[in-house]
């Protein structure tokens, strides 16, 4: 985007870690931030940090797995901060362990958050983004979305899906004013590891 100052950004998983850091970085550049997180305490803490920078923030407690709840967010954000021009789909979870030991429930859990959470976010906000003079979607993948790792099979699966989804969506929107970026962070110590599943989850801490 040509400018960030005066824009409204929606950041999921903004209550901690990369989501909080991204929110603060955008706020420092003049964006108002809609802080979206399933944990209200973390979301409020992030919002307070943003406001301490002299920037507006609103808090929206939401589970990205829930398409109905995600569908409610655009009108909530617009009512609090105005129409958004930036969407950062950052919310995610991880797992570590042998694929053979993972249950179907484990796989559905990580796919629902890491993949469907991104899809629900894009579906909910794309109509609003398409009305802006310039807009951008940022989807958080991982280095394992480029090169899958053993004992991180389910996580690699989801981040590879985010990569492919983002690249396809970018190509679909290339002639519009909505850009799409997919980000591939390396290993970063955040509290995503606190909720990790799998027999080797402890090694992530």
Predicted features along the sequence, with ranges:
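Residue(s) in the substrate-gating loop at a strand-loop-helix junction
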Residues: 142
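Active-site loop immediately N-terminal to the catalytic Tyr-X3-Lys motif
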Residues: 99-100, 147-153
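Substrate-binding pocket helix/loop in short-chain dehydrogenase/reductase
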Residues: 98-99, 103-108
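Conserved glycine-rich cofactor-binding loop
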Residues: 8, 15-16
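Active-site helix of classical SDR
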Residues: 122, 158
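The beta1-alpha1 cofactor-binding region of Rossmann-like NAD(H)/NADP(H)-dependent oxidoreductases
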Residues: 40-41, 61-72, 104
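SDR active-site lid
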Residues: 174-205
């Amino acid at each position: 985007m040509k400018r960030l100052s005066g824009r409204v950004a929606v950041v999921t998983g903004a209550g901690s870690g990369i989501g909080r850091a991204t929110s603060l970085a955008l706020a420092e550049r003049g964006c108002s931030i809609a802080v979206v997180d399933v944990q209200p305490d973390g979301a409020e803490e992030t919002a307070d940090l943003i406001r301490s920078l002299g920037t507006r923030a609103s808090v929206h407690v939401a589970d990205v797995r829930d398409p109905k709840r995600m569908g409610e967010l655009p009108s909530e954000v617009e009512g609090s901060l105005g129409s958004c021009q930036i969407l950062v789909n950052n919310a995610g979870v991880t797992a570590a362990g042998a694929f053979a030991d993972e249950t179907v429930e484990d796989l559905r859990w990580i796919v629902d958050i890491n993949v469907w959470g991104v899809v629900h976010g894009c579906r909910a906000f794309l109509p609003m983004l398409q009305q802006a003079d310039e807009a951008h979607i940022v989807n958080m993948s991982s280095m394992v979305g480029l090169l899958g790792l053993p004992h991180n099979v389910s996580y690699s699966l989801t981040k590879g899906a985010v990569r492919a989804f983002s690249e396809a969506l970018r190509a679909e929107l290339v002639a519009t004013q909505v850009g799409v970026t997919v980000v591939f962070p390396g290993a970063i110590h955040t509290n995503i590891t606190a909720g990790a599943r799998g027999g080797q989850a402890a090694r992530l801490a």
